């Protein structure tokens, strides 16, 4: 049986994550996913939006995932590899790990694990930052519309000072002279 290990934060689970994990599963018979602990996320990226228990449950609920575990809180990042003993570590196309460095360290530790970089996946909402950006953009537009709609009716209909936009129109659409 070929065991594949994938890893990530998986904060705001999205299609890019699903694609990564399903592609990783295709490399073997069993997929074990290491979900970054809250402490690791805080140290390396940002305050997590969803906590580790929720993230590991969401990832574990995916059909392609056989088991999801929470990674260690710090220390040796290779300890989990020694514990899980995967045949393959699948890296996402956008993960900032150097597969040659990982392979060299695994070899140095006597772990016969192969490291595979998965191919690029493109979708307009395939990343957490893209999703957050779209939400903020939509929220900004929504707030602008709300501000316009909250203006009193007189302010919406009243002509601007110094214009003749309140003058009656002739049948041809021009302004009638008074």
Per-region residue spans from a language model:
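Nucleotidyltransferase catalytic core that binds NTPs
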Residues: 1-178
């Amino acid at each position: 049986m070929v065991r594949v290990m994938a890893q990530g934060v998986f904060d705001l689970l999205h299609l890019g994550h699903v694609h990564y994990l399903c592609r990783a599963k295709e490399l073997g018979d069993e997929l074990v996913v290491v979900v970054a602990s809250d402490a690791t996320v805080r140290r390396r990226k940002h305050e997590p939006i969803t906590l580790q228990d929720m993230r590991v449950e969401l990832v574990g609920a995916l059909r392609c995932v056989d088991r999801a575990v929470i990674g260690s809180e710090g220390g040796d990042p290779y300890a989990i590899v020694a514990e899980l003993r995967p045949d393959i570590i699948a890296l996402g196309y956008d993960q900032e790990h150097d597969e040659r460095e990982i392979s060299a360290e695994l070899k140095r530790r006597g772990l016969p694990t192969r490291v595979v970089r998965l191919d690029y996946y493109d979708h307009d909402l395939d990343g957490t930052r893209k999703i957050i950006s779209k939400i903020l953009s939509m929220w900004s537009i929504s707030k602008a519309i709300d501000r316009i709609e909250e203006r009193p009716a007189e302010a919406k209909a009243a002509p601007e000072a110094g214009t003749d936009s309140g003058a009656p129109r002739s049948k041809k659409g021009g302004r009638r002279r008074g």
